[in-house]
């Protein structure tokens, strides 16, 4: 089980979300059988989605992040509910690339830098909020930071990391997101900048055994922070047979008739959890009748 924690500075001028998403990234790797670099990329996006989901207010709100930079991984999608429970998938789960010039997994090379980060927030209005920003890095954390600055005009700092073992399992994963609130004083900004300049990578801190509280404290440097709340988080798919039936109906009567006339069972697989739903021609026919 992962964990997400919210904090605020004593003067209320900045807040930070910090998360341990090791179990979430590990579950994604188990479901999608990703290679090392795509595990790292998807794990980072899931962590970002979890923290952005936790920022939503309504119980039924959700956020969807879609990243496509033209790299060999293709599109990456992560969706989170308002409690920070994400799910996601990557179009091409197995990508093999040399390590980058720092000797690290080449997430930028897998994601690509020629494309956009799309953010869709469903907060119960008639139409969801949709924002998009050009990919500036492909490393994902910098792209999240840029999204908040450009699309939401909110000064932010995002850090994400996933450490993958030689056997492709996940050793640790997590991240933090700092946002400045209106009227944030220069001293606070300066203290955060100083801390961020010297902080180790998220995965280094997690691998050293630092807790989420300790990582948040390091990220905020000399600033004192108060814990607001703490939640367990997990990889969570909300697919059901009823949702799949609804999706089948959107294919239209003509296509459903073709499936029925083929006389064979069909299999519908959920992209997020790989669960398979089977439908016989008779069940499809009943579904079509009920829809009329």
What are these regions (language model features)?
Residues 197-292:
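Cys/His-clustered metal-coordination modules, chiefly Zn-binding fingers
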